[in-house]
Amino acid sequence: MAAFERNPSRWKGTRFRRGLGASRIAAQAILSLTEKQSQGRWPSFPLGLKSKGTFRSASSYLLHQLIHRSHEAEAEQEEKQQEDGESEESEESEMQNLEDKYDGILREETVAEAITGLGWSGRGTEQVYLNLNLSHCELVDISILCGYVHLQKLNLSGNRIEDLSCVSCMPYLLELNASQNKLTTFFNFKPPQNLKKVDFSSNLISEMYDLSAYHTLTQLILDNNEIEEITGLENCISLTHLSLAGNKITTIKGLGTLPIKVLSLSNNMIETITGLEELKALQNLDLSHNQISSLQGLENHDLLEVINLEDNKIKELSEIEYIENLPILRVLNLLRNPIQTKPEYWFFVIYMLLRLTELDQQKIKVEEKVFAVNKYDPPPEVVAVQDHMTHVVNSMSQPQRIWDSTLPSLDAPYPMLILTGPAACGKRELAHRLCRQFSTYFRYGACHTTRPPYFGEGDRVDYHFISQEVFDEMLNMGKFILTFNYGNHNYGLNRDTIEGIARDGLASCIHMELEGVRSLKYSYFEPRYILVVPMDKEKYEGYLRRKGLFSRAEIEIAVSRVDLYVKVNQKYPGYFDAVINADDMDIAYQKLSELIREYLGLTETAAKTLAPTADTKTSYLKCEDYSRKSSTVEFLDSTDRNYFTKLWAKLSSKKSPVERESLHRQHEAARQALMGKTPRDHTLLFQRGPVPIPTVSGQQYFATIDELQKTFELSDDLFKTPSGTYPETSKDSNISKRYSTYFHTCPWSKELPFQLPEGGISSRPGSAGSDEVDGALKALRVASSMQEKVAQHKRLSAITIMDPGSNTKPTLPPIPHGRR
């Protein structure tokens, strides 16, 4: 190593010389050997001297030997290369000879290597091999398999076989795979007794033959052949899986009533879906890559779970209706169809087929199903919410002002009475009679509708009959409080109708269907809802037929909706404030008028019950005795409790300094209004028509004696019953009864953050004629105090017997005190 490190060039030269060839290496070895021999032959001279002649002869001899050895090495190398070429040629010739000798005939050695599955024979008497796999062996002749009678599974796929007659010798064969061969016919062998699965795909079969002898066949695969017609399967009574993909079939027929569960007919030339009517067990259907343009023919397959219609010509969304009623359809593939270009395709298909879990090879999310339902068939609650949102947004286009239906009291929303029930159940007649009897309190509010008037109906009396164009224009302008659709006709409650009634100081009495009630419940109005429903559906149906205004379909819908109203009343207690049986209109109006009288405080005692009389059927509406006895009391008293709860929640919540300052200004404005002071100039911008102001704690001012006298005269008219005025008992009690409505005490007035001026009812300061009404004022003051004591006693007694949580029912505020 040291020598190489000192002289690296010498080391490199040595490596180079060693790599030159075998001849030069041999020459170097001979040269070293010659040197040693010469040293032993000639004695060494002293001082290292040699004779010149001897040196020359030795050099020539070495050169001669080197050249000779070099020629010998080159000759040996040429001989070796020649031998290698000859060996390669011999190997190629041997391989060619072997190929020439292999003729595709199956031999014992090959079978021995491919046979597996040691088990018992069909008779169970001996152990044999049951499975043989000879796939992709380039076999042509398999006649040797005639001796393998115990085989149960035979795989011959990927060969060049043209004849399967040897299968006739396999009586116990269960499965046969002869795909990817050169068969031109199928089943040209004696049928094994229990043959179940056969695969003849990717052959040259062009025609199907009678397979009546193969009654045990359960699976038949004939893909990628040249079959044009399905025949010979009528008696395969056990066939459950049939695949004929990749053929030339144009019409589906010949399947009869087979128990097929899986059917594949993809990559054919089918244009219409026919011949599947009797396949009642069909579960999986593959008709992809055909020319189908309609889904007609897939109806009435109750067990169908998977449908593959990829790459066809389905265009219209209406085609989905043919598979809409398939109860357990889970997977549908409509990829590469013109129907996919429809903008509503995805959600429409999901809505029509809500049971789907996979569409076009994509999992369907729950959110997509909810969106689809809300888009195409939303629940009634969603419709009501959308309707309310539409009107709120559209109303922003109208000039913003304080509505006439906005009462000055924080705890008294505008009073409304809603009668609801099925079509032509009598709610409109009840509303008209009620408004005629209590004309100083109620006015009928007519809705707008796009339907034509029935016989006997008057425009602006029963409805405002308008065209669809006018209705849409009013809707876009935000003039409706609510709208709903019933019987393919639109109905709407116009805000101007309510404001016109409120401007005259009256409460609104309106009738509508349940859809309108749902929408109205989302608005800021809080009316009283009274359900008018016929209990005897047969009598109700006969009444509709006698009217002669409705078709048979409309009558059936109206009668069926009776159960809907009853179901809502039972499922949502408190949804309606009262229920009235509409089988007899006279009895129904008697109950309704009693209810309104108690509500207005026009009778001495409250009605004991709102339940129908003993001769009226009440099987649809069942309630407990306690609820029947207390229904009137709750109907009358729960208003104050409900609104006091709402008001107290608002007043007791923690408020910011800005909110407290705003409330202070509101209370100050209310106090000044009650004291009769003129508001500031800027408040005149929000003036409106005269609206009755409910009396609070019996406080009311009169400017002159004429106003007080007019009030007395008006009260005489208000409290007259149809049969006359109430009997007089005493002066104080008479005054108390006649003016109890005017001096109705607000139960939470003492808890409000402002105090009303003392003195009860008195003439306005500075007004003339105050001495003339002292007697009347004293009497009214006595009546007011008595009324307050009685009301306080009733409240205390009601609180003592009240169940916990019963004060949270949504009810309406007191109705205002008549026309001013």
Swiss-Prot record:
Q: What residue stretches are annotated with the Guanylate kinase-like domain?
A: 414-597
The residue ranges flagged as biased composition, category Acidic residues, are 84-94
Biological processes, Gene Ontology terms: axoneme assembly; cell differentiation; spermatogenesis
Q: Which residues cross the membrane?
A: none
Give the principal location in a single coarse category: cytoplasm
Cross-referenced CDD domains: GMPK (cd00071)
Keyword Cell division listed? The answer is: no
LRR repeat windows: 129-149, 150-171, 172-193, 194-215, 216-237, 238-259, 260-280, 281-302, 303-324
Question: InterPro entries this protein is in?
Answer: GK/Ca_channel_bsu (IPR008145), Guanylate_kin-like_dom (IPR008144), Leu-rich_rpt (IPR001611), LRR_dom_sf (IPR032675), P-loop_NTPase (IPR027417)
Keyword check for Cytoplasm, yes or no: yes
Tell me how this protein assembles. Answer: Interacts (via guanylate kinase-like domain) with RIMBP3 (via coiled-coil region). Interacts (via guanylate kinase-like domain) with HOOK2. Interacts (via LRRCT domain) with KLC3. Interacts with HOOK1 and HOOK3.
Annotated protein name in UniProt: Leucine-rich repeat and guanylate kinase domain-containing protein
Q: Which organism is it from?
A: Mus musculus (Mouse)
- List the taxonomic lineage: Eukaryota, Metazoa, Chordata, Craniata, Vertebrata
